Amino acid sequence: MTGSLFIITAASGTGKTSLVKQLLATTNDLTVSVSHTTREPRPGEIDGHHYHFTDVNKFVTAISESQFLEHAEVFGNYYGTSEQSVRAQLDAGVDVILEIDWQGALQVKKIFTDAIMIFILPPSIATLRQRLSTRGQDSMEVIEQRLAGAVNEMAQYVNFDYVIINDSFEVALTELKAIIVADRQTLKRQQQRYQRTITNLLSNTVDE
């Protein structure tokens, strides 16, 4: 059985990473693709778990060798998704989440046309500013850069299949789970999962 590809995008500070983390903790057969990046690790980040940290030269070489499903430059740092890794997980029947920006999302959609695209929005710019400041990961200069680009990022929601407003974490998480569950009940997925059962039902045979 082939897994589904879910692309989740949001402006920085919207709560995407926290939602995905909780979703993974409560959902079976679901994983998140670990991106490659040239940025420096933040406190507490582990190489190979949060990101595959690399340098610019190695990243550029990987681009030239077409190793990335998508890649983009964000605030002076490069980010990319390994195509080989994603395809291997999907072929193993695992649903895969890509946490990437809207540029990368549109790149991936051209290759995986069945990918399910989800955009998460904050309830307001004021809330977004507060969340960016509270998490204490970036300087005020970086926060202002992120806010300046947030409106343009959020305007891309029209290119996505689903939109979630993260005003209440629990409500947003429930809505995110609902999208995953609904996809797993589609005709294509159920035919793959229950092929033998359906065959037996339609042939009037009893499975011993």
UniProtKB/Swiss-Prot annotation:
**InterPro entries assigned:** GK/Ca_channel_bsu, Guanylate_kin-like_dom, Guanylate_kinase, Guanylate_kinase_CS, P-loop_NTPase
Q: Using the record's annotation, list all stretches that form the Guanylate kinase-like domain.
A: 3-181
> Which PANTHER family does the UniProt entry name for this protein?
GUANYLATE KINASE, GUANYLATE KINASE-RELATED
| Enzyme Commission number | 2.7.4.8
Give an example GO molecular function: guanylate kinase activity
User: What's the name of the protein?
Assistant: Guanylate kinase
Q: Which reaction does it catalyse?
A: GMP + ATP = GDP + ADP
Question: Which annotated residues bind ATP?
Answer: 10-17
The record's SUPFAM superfamilies line, in alphabetical order, gives:
P-loop containing nucleoside triphosphate hydrolases
What NCBIfam families does this protein's entry cite? guanyl_kin
GO terms under cellular component: cytosol
The UniProt family comment states:
Belongs to the guanylate kinase family.
Q: What does this protein do?
A: Essential for recycling GMP and indirectly, cGMP.
Tell me the name of the encoding gene.
gmk
Q: Which UniProt keywords apply?
A: ATP-binding, Cytoplasm, Kinase, Nucleotide-binding, Transferase
Entries under HAMAP family matching the protein: Guanylate_kinase
Query: Where does this one sit in the cell?
Result: Cytoplasm
